């Protein structure tokens, strides 16, 4: 059977830029008559008004999606602390009275649940950024230590994992759709 039509996928930029594009490229080659559109967004509610067909979302581990959506976990995200080697030479996070600082996540800073059991909770926050791309760039500029997904930061040659910090799985990647889309036929 030959499939045709359009599919709209929404996802966060971190997934789109670092994980999704190879899959979209293969899909487009296998199904040339299906036009795939990728919309960058972090809102789960995009599915509510039939704006998109599929949402790929990063959700805290063990958190379930809203009841009006169906889906499954398609991956796990390991996170770890990163900095430049130069920053770590100048600011050892493990010495008492360390001058090392964290690059915080958005408005929450260290109040974010992600920092609850952090080995670096004792450090102050130098700045806050609500986007992984900004945090990556800030860390590359030696502005501090940042907590990033390993699939992003491990590829960055100017960053290293902070010694004594092990990657942790804190988030799942969910593929979600509206429950009434379960039986949608492809033309």
Protein language model regions, located:
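Short loop or secondary-structure boundary microenvironments that flank
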Residues: 13, 152, 179-180
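Short, well-ordered beta-strand segments
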Residues: 8-10, 55, 103, 146, ...
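A late-sequence structural motif
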Residues: 165-187
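Residue-level signal for threonine
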Residues: 12, 84, 184
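Central regulatory/effector-binding core of bacterial HTH transcription factors
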Residues: 4-66
């Amino acid at each position: 059977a030959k499939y045709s039509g359009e599919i709209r996928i929404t996802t966060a930029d971190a997934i789109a830029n670092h994980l999704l594009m190879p899959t979209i490229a293969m899909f487009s080659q296998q199904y040339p008559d299906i036009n795939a559109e990728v919309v960058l967004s972090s809102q789960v509610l995009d599915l509510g008004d039939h704006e998109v067909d599929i949402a790929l979302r990063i959700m805290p581990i063990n958190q379930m999606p809203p009841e009006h959506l169906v889906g499954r976990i398609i991956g796990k995200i390991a996170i770890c602390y990163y900095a430049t080697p130069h920053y770590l030479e100048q600011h050892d996070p493990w010495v008492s009275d360390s001058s090392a600082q964290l690059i915080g996540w958005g408005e929450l800073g260290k109040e974010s649940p992600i920092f609850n059991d952090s080995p670096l909770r004792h450090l102050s926050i130098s700045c806050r950024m609500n986007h992984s791309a900004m945090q990556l760039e800030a860390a590359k500029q030696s502005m501090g230590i940042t907590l990033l997904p390993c699939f992003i930061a491990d590829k960055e040659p100017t960053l290293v994992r902070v010694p004594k910090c092990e990657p942790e799985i804190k988030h799942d990647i969910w593929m979600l759709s509206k429950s009434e889309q379960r039986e949608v036929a492809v033309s």
